[in-house]
Amino acid sequence: MQQRKNSWTGAGQWLGALLVAGLLAGCQTVQTTGAGQVGVTRNQYMGVSSAEVDAASAQSYRKMLQEAERKKELNVDAAMLARVQGIAKRLVAQTTHFRPDAQGWRWETNVFHSDQVNAFCMAGGKIGIYSGLIEKLKITDDELAAVMGHEIAHALREHVREQVSLQQAARVPGLVLAIVTGSQVLADLGNMVTDVSLTLPRSREAETEADQIGVELAARAGYDPRAAISLWQKMNQLGGGRPPEFLSTHPSPDSRQQDLARLSAVVLPLYEQSRKR
């Protein structure tokens, strides 16, 4: 009986090695953007194609628009839409400093009438702004540019594609552990540890990169990059307490504001140059 158990363990380890090898073979190391003035240089590991993620994002975006339109919650305020689209246009024009190919994306910008304080930019340039963000924060144009620049940066860096790839990688240790031990409890524990060790740190890196690129996009587009600091102060006041940095996919409010102050100083000359044009 003991011999049979060892046999299964050996087979599980062999299968686990094959799974890991297969996953790694499907990944590639890429640099999705130029470094810019802020110096974003991290290599990224991708296991799925841009085309797959872009197609899925476009489909999801279409469904969101259809649902919002059905509920009469899409682009309700014409003046608000014009304001948002105007800022988006200026920001998108600056994406060439990080990704020349982004000018060929099918950019779209829409406003969802909702109390949510939220915004996003899906892969391929599908932007969504919630009216609650504008109304509850009494947001200025500079602050709105900070939000949108941050979200556009996620798309430029293809963070969704990277996260999907990392989630694929994160499943492997738990699966191997379940095969080797036959224990679902241990498999769940393995996935939890993998999440904290692999997925969360990468997510914080993604947020930092989005802050870096976002403030530069805003500055180059003629928006005061220092508005990112006041924006996150407002967000922190509105949101109340936040989870500790170790267990969050976002940097803590205090450390984020410090980083934004440093980044704003780096790109402030770009803002001053843009105002002279």
Identify the residue ranges that each predicted region occupies.
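A Zn2+-metalloprotease active-site environment signal
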Residues: 2-17, 24-277
